[in-house]
Structure formats: C-alpha cells, structure tokens
Amino acid sequence: MSGFIDEVPIQIRAGHGGAGSVHFHKEKFVEFGGPDGGDGGKGGDVIFLAEGRMMTLENYLPDRMYAAQDGEPGLGQNRNGKNGEDLILKVPVGTQIIDSVTMELIYDFNHDGESFTIATGGRGGKGNTFFKTSVQQAPRYSQPGEEGGAFSLILELKLLADIGIVGLPNAGKSTLLAKITHAHPKIAGYAFTTLSPNLGVVHRHEDLFRYTVADIPGIIEGASRGVGLGISFLKHIERVQGILFLFDGGNLQLEEELEMLRSELGNYNQTLLDKKFLLVINKMDIWDNDPSFTEEIQKKYSHLGEIICISADKEFNLEYLLERIDKVFFTEKVKLVYENT
C-alpha cells in the first residue's frame, strides 16, 4: 500500500451563485423594451462520496483549496445562467470529516457509495425582470449571487476492519494476513517491514460470510511515546470486533509481550482493552509443530486467554484458527448465515 496517507487537512468551498442580469428587451421599432434580465445560476455543491476501492487519502494535497464551480451570470431575454457543476470528492470508506476549527466530527463514512453534501452552492441572484413592478417599470438593478459554503477540514481515515492483527515487529503478521486473505503485503525477515496497515478479506462458509482483517505495523515498548513507528496506526483497529495478538514462537516471552502490547494499546485508547481477543503463537514449525510442546504452552499460559498455535508460513493449523475466529467473534453472524440458507 504505497503512498498510504490517513490524515490530511484541506479547504473546501462551494460555488458562488451567479449574478442576476440587468438587461432590457431590444426589438426593432420598440423604443422602450421592458426588463428581461435572467437570474444567475446556482453555485455547485461540494459532495463527499465513499469509494470502497480506495484505501488511502493520498490523492489529497495538504491545505489545498477544493472548490466547486461558480454559477454563471444571468443573460438577457430572461435566460438564466448555468448552474455550477458540483465537486465530487471521493474518499475511502472509514473516512471521517472533522471541522479543523472546532475539531468536531462532521461526518463518518461507513458504507461504499455513501455520500454527504458538506457545502451547498450559493443561490443565483435575481435578474432585473424579478424587480419589475407597476411602479418600477424599468429597474436598473439586479441581485448579486450568494456565496457558497466554505470549511477548513481534516480528513481522517480509520480503516473499517473486523479483526486487527497486533504484535511485535517480525511476529509474522503480514504472512498470516496473506495466507488467510490472499492479500499481498510486503513480507521480509526483518522488523518494520510493514510501514502502513494492510487490509484483506477472509471468505468463509462457501463465501456466504466474509470479514476484513487489518495487519497493523509492529508495536514496540514505548510506541505510545513515539518510539519505533509510534501507535498512530492503531486508529485503524478502533472499530474492530476482535484482536489477534500474534507472537513469535521462536522467541516466546508471551506474558511479558502481551502485557507490553496491552499497555501500549491502553495508552492509545482504553476501549481497545475491552475488545475480545485470541492469543496466536506463530512459527511453530520451528518446533516441528510438536503437539506436546503446544500442549505445554497452552497449559502454562492458559490464565492469559485462549491460545492457538500455528505456522502461517507452513499453513499449519490455520483452518482451526479461522474456526475459532468464527466462534469467538462472529457466532451470531455465522448462525444467521446457516439459518438463511
């Protein structure tokens, strides 16, 4: 996911309404034609549209003004000016629009195709025809167009994932994501390979049920203070239903690592600690996927939560992991799938 941008300040302005026309009817042999100035066109609106295929805000330049088209001025012969074209700004699903002055949330996009008109174009001004009365037969004035709405905004993207994979660098998060979703994150044998979130879709039960999984960049101790890559990427799992804590089975310090990870999550947002979770120990192929060793680990650390041992690279025990994800996080949804088939 190159060029991943999840926050950008922008300016937006709806179109100015066109001015009304001051014009009089002109016709051969008619000395005093009456007013026939048309109205100005309405300014274009600024509309945000959620696009399911977008994954980043990289198309937006910081502090740039994004303006809809102004309405055109009115014309003679009672012809109204053309309305300005609306400006459609596409954003990823999960984008929040925030007022940069008050920092209030204006809108939160949760569905593909969802739209929101953030600023309405100004009304066009009335032409002098509108002002003709029995007393004032030839008004020589018209109305200016109104200004369109304008805002200073912050666009903030929070990916809409159902499950978040959290762990230390090099725990195998990207490999696990690739194996269970067929996503294509960058994978290598060194820390901080993942520099931005990756998202994939798991297809279950003959594709009758799907859910999204986010692979979050590695977290290290002190991340909440900006160490390593920091924890700003945790915004992308604020809305998940569950968390997979992933550990390196070749260098296992489960209790200490879990305590550190949960501490960093809590420092970012305490509500993350209330989410359901599974403890997943990866790279068990180092131990030849030994059942007795797996049993020993599960017994030793059972007080911490449910433990599942896998090898993402060798695809060992992945189906069981997916079954447990179904059961722990999506029981009701899976039940509905079978009730409706």
From Swiss-Prot:
InterPro entries: G_OBG, GTP-bd, GTP-bd_Obg/CgtA, GTP1-OBG_CS, GTP1_OBG_dom, GTP1_OBG_dom_sf, OBG_GTPase, P-loop_NTPase
Subcellular location field: Cytoplasm
Residues annotated to bind Mg(2+): S174, T194
Cross-referenced SUPFAM superfamilies: Obg GTP-binding protein N-terminal domain (SSF82051), P-loop containing nucleoside triphosphate hydrolases (SSF52540)
Protein's UniProt keywords contain Cytoplasm: yes
Swiss-Prot/TrEMBL GO biological process terms: ribosome biogenesis
Top-rank lineage group of the source organism: Bacteria
Pfam families: GTP1_OBG (PF01018), MMR_HSR1 (PF01926)
Binding sites annotated in the UniProt record for GTP: 167-174, 192-196, 215-218, 282-285, 311-313
NCBIfam families the record matches: Obg_CgtA, PRK12299.1
Similarity remark: Belongs to the TRAFAC class OBG-HflX-like GTPase superfamily. OBG GTPase family.
Function: An essential GTPase which binds GTP, GDP and possibly (p)ppGpp with moderate affinity, with high nucleotide exchange rates and a fairly low GTP hydrolysis rate. Plays a role in control of the cell cycle, stress response, ribosome biogenesis and in those bacteria that undergo differentiation, in morphogenesis control.
Name of the protein this chain belongs to: GTPase Obg
Species per Swiss-Prot/TrEMBL record: Leptospira biflexa serovar Patoc (strain Patoc 1 / ATCC 23582 / Paris)
Higher taxonomy: Bacteria, Pseudomonadati, Spirochaetota, Spirochaetia, Leptospirales
